[in-house]
Amino acid sequence: DKNKNEFYDDVKESYLKLLNKIKKNEKKIYNIENRNKIIDYFYEDDKICENKVIEVITGDHKALEKVIKEIGVLEKNKDDKKLHDEFESIYNNFTNREFGRTWGKKIGVEICPYCNRSFIYTTPKKGTWPQYDHYYPKSKYPYLALSMYNLIPCCPVCNNAKNAEDTFDNKSLLYPFEEEYGYDIFFEIETDEQLCYLGLSNDFNIKIKSKENVEEDLKQKVQNSSKILHIEELYNLHNDYVSKLLRSKYIFTDEYCQSLLDTYPGWFFDMNEVKNQLYFNSLQKEEWG
């Protein structure tokens, strides 16, 4: 995988240097217990095991969970702030370079995968790029600070809301690279005002709902994501936009869309393209990215 290789080549040197520094511990600045957890995992016969470094830097979701089970939590406290600072430093070095700033764009993430409402633009020359959330918080698992599949390009609102939520112990949030809302999770409006359904009033509340056949694990993660990231609150800021969508749904019937397709056959490939044009969005799951 090209992206994996590029990511590993970019960060491995700084990671290897830090591991050597931690092992030497010349100034005795690291907490012995935490230091030994790092050394015991990464070193074999007094040498760094590169396969384990590769696993930490480019391993997938399941691989990272395995690493966490072996190394465990390295809590940041006054006795071992230095170890966390070292991992924080190599992470900051990554985000301060063009490779790190453009990583989200390179892997094709243009909209925050947590809320799916905020664009995350990457224009390094103008000082604009996404923030990176650590799905497994670096405050507890600092050795995953530069793990490719632990870095979630996201918007500042979601990054701040999630903060140091421990997604390993309580499995609280959807993992954006592998899990999704899809067609099984949807938004619904709640209102006593009938005009809302015609898009003529925005006096309603937006709620996240799930189909009856959705697995309980997914349903719980969706509820947790909504609570922790304030998804419903954020979407209720856009009632006016939702009203316009409802009005469009009422006005632009299937018959109307078919008439557009028949009248302008050279403009639209099929009915899906007509509806995408009317709603200014892709309604087909395979095009969501």
Q: In which residue ranges do the predicted regions lie?
A:
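Short Cys/His-rich Zn2+-coordinating modules
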Residues: 88-101, 133-140
